[in-house]
Design a protein with these regions (language model features):
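Active-site nucleophile/metal-coordination loop of metallo-enzymes that catalyze phosphate/sulfate
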Residues: 13-147, 152-164, 168, 197, ...
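Active-site glycine-rich loop that binds ribose-phosphate moieties when present
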Residues: 131-135, 171-179, 217-221
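Anion-binding catalytic surfaces of enzymes that hydrolyze or transfer phosphate/sulfate esters
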Residues: 145-153, 157-158, 184, 188-291
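Structural signal for hydrophobic packing residues in well-ordered secondary-structure cores
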Residues: 40, 56, 120, 143, ...
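Alpha-helical scaffold segments in soluble metabolic enzymes
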Residues: 35, 87-90, 115, 138, ...
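Beta-strand elements within well-structured catalytic alpha/beta cores of enzymes
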Residues: 3-17, 91, 229, 277-290
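Gly/Ser/Thr-rich active-site loops/lids in small-molecule metabolic enzymes
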Residues: 37, 173-177, 260
Length: 291
């Protein structure tokens, strides 16, 4: 069967239960959708239910169906890793054998932080594995007073830099991320991504991350299906952070989004566009706003 257009939509970080290797990453029991359903006393998602979403697990309020209107299945990663790049690259046929370096338990080495501070002219606070919302409550007011960078990591291979847009200009934040990316090209610190995490707000409990996030990723180490599609003369439209994840490799057109709703509205608009190929969409709010 041949399709002129394919829409691949990734609900970033919206998991339906832990994977087979969850214990390896201390993620056993993870189930974002299941927990949302429980806290909200069930979800009313009739369209997804008819497609067969309820058949993927036990989700309160979402019934299973005997005749789903779509093909449904669960996937487990074959790659060695669990971060954004590893997962998205594997979707496009690129299996990662050697996981990216993580600093979850230790934070980044002093040598790395010292070099970053010297090159950017600002001190750092944080340097721990932490939720992106929690770290702002911990250090947001401190940054307003001092102008220090808030840096942190996670279970993923990332160096994240948070900056209040009213204190540190966006361009300075982006430049600092480029500096961090250059430093982190050293094999001993080679993380998968450096991420700019701008936010606004003035006091604990009222900080909000903005849509001006930007990822500085390593390029895929080999060709992906995106390259094959592009080389075949087909359209490859990256929506949201997809172009960042692949460092524009194999992408023919980029569409920026500011939220999940904006991402879906732009995807709906694309349905009226007479392109021929793939629209690859990432809905990032589950991670960027709530992660």
């Amino acid at each position: 069967m041949k399709f002129n257009r394919i829409f691949l939509i990734v609900c970033d970080s919206m998991g339906i239960g832990n994977a087979k290797d969850a214990k390896k990453y201390n993620d056993f029991g993870a189930n974002t959708v299941g927990h949302i359903c429980s806290i909200c006393d069930g979800l009313n998602i009739p369209t997804l239910q008819n497609l067969g979403f309820g058949n993927l697990g036990d989700f309160k309020g979402v019934a299973k169906t005997q005749n789903p209107q779509a093909y449904i299945l669960k996937l487990n990663e074959a790659s060695n890793g669990k971060d954004t790049m590893t997962g998205h690259w594997e979707m496009m046929g690129l299996k990662t054998e050697k996981p990216f370096i993580t600093f979850t338990d230790t934070g980044f080495p002093k040598e790395f932080i010292d070099l970053f501070e010297k090159k950017t002219g600002r001190k750092c606070v944080g340097n721990i594995a932490c939720s992106g919302t929690k770290i702002l409550d911990m250090y947001g007011e401190h940054q307003i007073k001092t102008g220090d960078w808030i840096v942190y990591t996670s279970a993923d291979s990332v160096f994240q830099i948070a900056a209040n847009e009213d204190i540190i200009p966006l361009e300075e934040l982006y430049h600092a991320c480029q500096i961090a990316r250059e430093i982190a090209m050293d094999d001993k610190w080679k993380v998968g991504r450096v991420i700019a995490r701008p936010y606004i707000g003035t006091k604990e409990g009222h900080f909000t991350r903005t849509s001006n996030r930007h990822d500085y990723a390593l390029a895929p180490f080999s060709k992906t299906a995106l390259d094959s599609l592009k080389d075949a003369g087909l359209d490859v439209i990256g929506v949201g952070k997809i172009p960042d994840i692949f460092v524009d490799q194999g992408i023919t057109r980029k569409i920026k989004t500011v939220s999940n709703e904006d991402g879906m509205n732009k995807t709906i608009e694309l349905a009226s566009d007479n392109f021929n190929g793939l629209a690859f969409i990432n809905l990032v709010d589950f991670d960027a706003v709530y992660g």
